[in-house]
Amino acid sequence: MRHWEAATNNPDDPSKPFADLMVGYPKVIFSRTNQTVSGINATMATKPIVEAIQELKQQDGKDIIAYGGAGFVTSLIENGLIDELNLFINPTAIGEGLTIFSGKTPFELDNSTRYGCGIVVNKYVPVK
């Protein structure tokens, strides 16, 4: 969050337009280690992930974007809380990693977007 907040104050930063959006959005933070959060429009979740996300999905408003590690994303998938899954495929081999799928979770490809830097974003939706 600090990066985006700093970028909003720098008119020469090429990421400023995106930073302005990111800083303006409300953010709910889930953490196993931190109990407090600082940042513009940021609050610390007070409920377990599944319960908190279910409540957020019931609120009026726009889409929810969830960024997180493998455990976080796995819990969303396992509990049917994903309406759309965007997988960013980066052409860098790391050799190892954590899976976000713990069982059979049917998704179907909605579309793919290729970017000049080599990254491909595959958008999947759950099979209902």
Q: What annotation goes with each model-predicted range?
A:
Residues M1-K128:
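Enzymes that bind and transform nitrogen-containing heteroaromatic metabolites
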